[in-house]
Curated annotation (Swiss-Prot):
An individual GO BP term: mitochondrial respiratory chain complex III assembly
Keyword Chaperone belongs to the record: yes
Subunit structure as annotated in this protein's UniProt entry: Interacts with UQCRFS1.
Organism name: Danio rerio (Zebrafish)
Entry annotated with the keyword Mitochondrion: yes
GO molecular-function term, one example from the UniProt record: protein folding chaperone
Family according to the record: Belongs to the complex I LYR family.
Protein name as catalogued: Complex III assembly factor LYRM7
A Pfam family hit: Complex1_LYR
Domain of life: Eukaryota
Coiled-coil boundaries: none
Role this protein plays: Assembly factor required for Rieske Fe-S protein UQCRFS1 incorporation into the cytochrome b-c1 (CIII) complex. Functions as a chaperone, binding to this subunit within the mitochondrial matrix and stabilizing it prior to its translocation and insertion into the late CIII dimeric intermediate within the mitochondrial inner membrane.
Listed GO CC annotations: mitochondrial matrix
Name of the gene: LYRM7
Length: 104
């Protein structure tokens, strides 16, 4: 696959992830869109294959972090926050046990 297609694919993947991660949060959606577009425009004239590969690697890492680590939270009261995790984050969730297990 050509470099141009790889860049376009990463660009689209970042925007898809942005839409999924920040669903129903217009402020975060807009800020993420602006930042993604700004970074890609800033580097659109890059010609070095090594630099492009490094930037693609970084963009993939950012996309992975957004997809796997970011969770939405909303203040609903002075001392209350509602978390809205995506289903993909809960698949590998293991309940925390506060009591240590006894060894026999």
């Amino acid at each position: 696959m050509g470099t141009r297609l790889k860049v376009l694919r990463v660009f689209k993947d970042l925007h898809r992830t942005r839409r999924d991660v920040f669903r129903d949060d217009n402020r975060a959606l807009t800020a993420a869109r602006v930042k993604i577009n700004e970074e890609f425009k800033k580097n659109k004239n890059e010609t070095s294959d090594d630099n492009i590969k490094e930037m693609l690697k970084m963009a993939r890492a950012v996309e992975t972090i957004l997809r796997e680590s970011v969770i939405q939270a909303e203040h609903v009261d002075e001392n209350k926050i509602v978390l809205r995790p995506r289903k993909s984050l809960l698949l590998e969730n293991v309940p925390y046990c506060d009591a240590p297990s006894k060894k026999t």
